[in-house]
Amino acid sequence: MATPELMLSLGLIEKDVNADTLWVWCYPSIDADLREVMLRKCCLTLDNQVLHTFVFGQFCRTWYYITTVEVQEPTVLKKVTHFSIVVTAKDFNPEKYAAFSRVLCRTYMKHGSPVKMMEGYIAVLTKGICQSDENGSFLIKDYDVRKALLAGSLKDVVSQFGMETIILYTALMLKKRVVVYHPRIEALLEFTRALPCLVWHRKDWSILHPFVHLENDELENLKVCTGYVAGFVDPEVKDRSDLFDVFVNLPDSEITVSQNAKEAMSMGKLHKEIGNFIVQAAEDADRSDAQVIKDISVKTKEILSNLMSLADHADNSKLTLECLKQGHYPPATENFLFHLAAAEQLLKI
Amino acid sequence: MEEVDRILIHSLRQAGTDIDEDVQSVKQFTSELIVEAVVRCLRVIDPAVGNGLSHSLPPGMSARFRLGMSLAQACQDVGFKGEIGYQTFLYSNEPEIRSLFMFLVERLPRESAEASDQPAGKSVLLQRAIAAQIKAQLSVPWLPPTCRLPVHRKTQSSGPCHSFHAQPLSLPCSLKVSSRKQPKEVQEYWRNYLLPVTAQPSQPASVPASLLENHISELSAAQEWESEWNSQGLLSRLTPEEYRSRKKARLQKRIEEQLRTAAQPRPDTHGATRSTSDLAELLQSFGGASTGGDVLTKGTRFTHTEKFTFTQEPEKAVQQMAAAASALPSSQQSEEDLKAQQEAELSALQQQLQQLSVQMEEVGGGIKQLTVSIQQVTDELQTREVTNAERENSVKIKRQTIDLLPDAENNLLKLQSLVESSSKRVVQLASQWEKHRVPLIDEHRRLKELCSNRESESSRKLSEIKDLHDKIRQSAEEAKKKESLYKQLLTEFETLSKDVSRSAYTIRILEIVGNIKKQKEEITKILSDTKDLQKEINGLTGKLDRTFAVTDELVFKDAKKDESVRKSYKYLAALHENCTQLIQTIEDTGTIMREIRDLEEQIETENGKRTVSNLEKILEDYKAIRQENSALAAKIREG
């Protein structure tokens, strides 16, 4: 799975004694738009000196991983106070790139030259291994993508929101837009990466935008996607009702469904059933997170196969509203199934 | 003493005492005058005390005595510490009276002097001028209109009075619109068609009011701009025009934002779409119109909203009216017909409505389905596009691989070596690039530092400039204040009565002070002379004593041997004794002379006290009292 060519580029941002943050180096290349976004994310441009050692996110289907370090002891980097190492890649695997960038950071701190860093990068690219000066070496094989996907804890999500988790489940199933707000980036990253696990059968992590600023370029990129999970640290996002169908206020443990999504998100007996199932599965102390995810996935597949069975087999296994109506479901369930069919691309057009 | 007396008399006159011109000193004061002066002073110092006393001496002796007693009491109440009684007033002597007057004059309040010390502003001056004018006008008696002279007509007729009624004026040169920027047409209008200001208002009487109003509005606008520019504009480091345009853009943006948030569509409110479209129109018109207008002119926003509310409504109203008019049935039809027709119409309409709502529902369901399917399709399209791109990539790679497949082992080796060599080359290139990059980055940082240094320097200078501005303003204000004060004082000085006495007094006082200084110098000189003399005397006495002792001893020694020497010793002793006596006598004479002088002085002071005349007066008064007493006793007896 973990093929090395998933890595796209390597970049270096430095903050110097003039409090000036600057892109100083990159290999092979990063386009200007992405560079600007990276500058915003690396938290060096902000005046408040809160340092986020590791952040990640997605922009235009490119994942970025930024490790920021403060230069403390006297090194070769005389005029530099902080620097960030930016790795962009095609795949979602925070742990892998965190480890890799830590190695790179140490190298750069020691030598003060990006050439050594680049040697490491090329080694990983060609051989899948990078020799570190201390602590052994970085082996790309150690980091399986499955592990990365399972790293988020659904149990924590359910323990925080309880029965309300069903709203998140429904929203994700119907490919709705979910916006999560928390003032701390770390909490945001932790929480949002767990949400796609609710729809494990799709294994689509491209809906995840864990760290978005309220800036035009990023919002444009977000609006292109049909459904997403986006994390914001800016409390103003609450007033941007054009950005979300479901708003999660993480510090207050509040979930709000926006007015224009209420109809599509109306819930019925089926939801109650699934909700109870999720809560029970998550509360079971013996079950691991992976097992919980699996349980939910099984349940989802059950629903989907139900839905498939309704489809007209003669007609390329596609559904119509009439087919659904023959099932005589309660209106809320019918509505849900109809939208679900659209989300799973089962509708006949 | 003459000077003191004149000052005293001047002050007493000011306090209200009527003193004859020929009275020049306190010595000339009669008892009546003294009583009057004291009472007047007391009235000024403490009205509660002074008002209970009469300022003229009563004819009856006992009444006079009582008045004297109460006056003495009042003086003590006010704070006079010296010896005082009825005799002070009735049988006056000069020094006592003088000290009493000096005390009283000192206690007189000096409000007039204090008031003139405080600086008065322009408004105070104006108010004073108004007060003076009103006083002057009030002093002129009112005359019936026919009897008025032209002088009176100005102030007493009601003819020229108008209410303050201002009208907007149009002026070619004003602060708000600089003449250069205006289009040619406007300039031509100014040149050829604009009426002079005197002809612009509808009534000629409101010309001054309008001009004043116009002037004040421009002045206040200019001041506002000045203060804003000094406080904020200067710090923004922009030229005034740039600052203005930036402020304009900012305001416009804010207003637009406010309107936009207010216009956010709410699904549960009916007619929201209408108001939003209206607001959108407004926004558009606002954006379009205000680009040409001047944001500083107040009321742009209001005129636009006005236009908006008043132009839209009438059109709609007209349309509605027309529709209603056509629907009205002709009144000539009978009522029943009308009813039946109405019912039929009603049912038909209801049917239509039902049909329409059913249709609506159907179409709504269709729309919903379609939107959902559109969503699905777009979603699918996106995923397809992504997978397509991925597949294309993989196809490319696979094709290359297939090309290399026939000679797999060789090619693999070749590829590996290629990868290795190219990675080495890349690293090499990177290190070469590093050689160029590092100096460039360093240069960038150095320049940036320089730049920030310069910036801080410039901001420092800017703050300095601001300080200077403040200082200039302060100084200007101060100068203005001082100038006005100077003017005020000048006018006051001109209006002051040319009373030379004051300057004369000051000159005299200065002279007196000079004299006193001179006298003091002389006294110190005499004192030092005296001291020198004393010293000399002491020295001589000591010398004498020593000489005598030595001579005495010498002569005494020889006296035992020689008879003639004994004789001379006796003479010596006698001489010494006589001389001592002589000195003693001289000293005694000195003391006696001094005593004589003291006594002479005492006699003079006693003479000054007019004892003889006072005694005669006392005797007379005593006789008068006795007469009064006997008269009273006779009356009692008769009664």
Swiss-Prot record, chain A:
Segments passing through the bilayer: none
Keyword Chloroplast: no
GO cellular component assignments: late endosome
Single Gene Ontology BP annotation: protein transport
GO molecular-function terms, A-Z: guanyl-nucleotide exchange factor activity; small GTPase binding
Domain cDENN residues, every copy: 160-294
Main location, first listed in the record: other
Record's keyword terms, sorted: Endosome, Guanine-nucleotide releasing factor
Domain uDENN stretches: 1-135
Family membership noted in the UniProt record: Belongs to the DENND10 family.
Function recorded in the entry: Guanine nucleotide exchange factor (GEF) which may be involved in the regulation of late endocytic pathway homeostasis, including endosomal positioning, maturation and secretion.
Protein name per its UniProtKB record: DENN domain-containing protein 10
Species per Swiss-Prot/TrEMBL record: Danio rerio
Originating gene: dennd10
From Swiss-Prot, chain B:
Superkingdom in the source lineage: Eukaryota
This protein's GO CC annotations: centrosome; endosome
One Pfam family cited in the UniProt record for this chain: CCDC22_CC
Gene Ontology molecular function: any one: cullin family protein binding
Keyword field contains Cytoplasm: yes
TM segment ranges: none
Keyword entries, A-Z: Coiled coil, Cytoplasm, Cytoskeleton, Endosome, Protein transport, Transport, Ubl conjugation pathway
Coiled coil: 331-370, 459-541, 591-638
Major location (coarse): other
Localization of this protein: Endosome; Cytoplasm, Cytoskeleton, Microtubule organizing center, Centrosome
Record GO biological process: positive regulation of ubiquitin-dependent protein catabolic process; protein transport
Keyword Protein transport among record annotations: yes
Family from the record: Belongs to the CCDC22 family.
Physiological role: May be involved in regulation of NF-kappa-B signaling. May be involved in copper-dependent atp7a trafficking between the trans-Golgi network and vesicles in the cell periphery.
Protein name: Coiled-coil domain-containing protein 22
Species whose genome carries this gene: Danio rerio
Lineage start: Eukaryota, Metazoa, Chordata, Craniata, Vertebrata
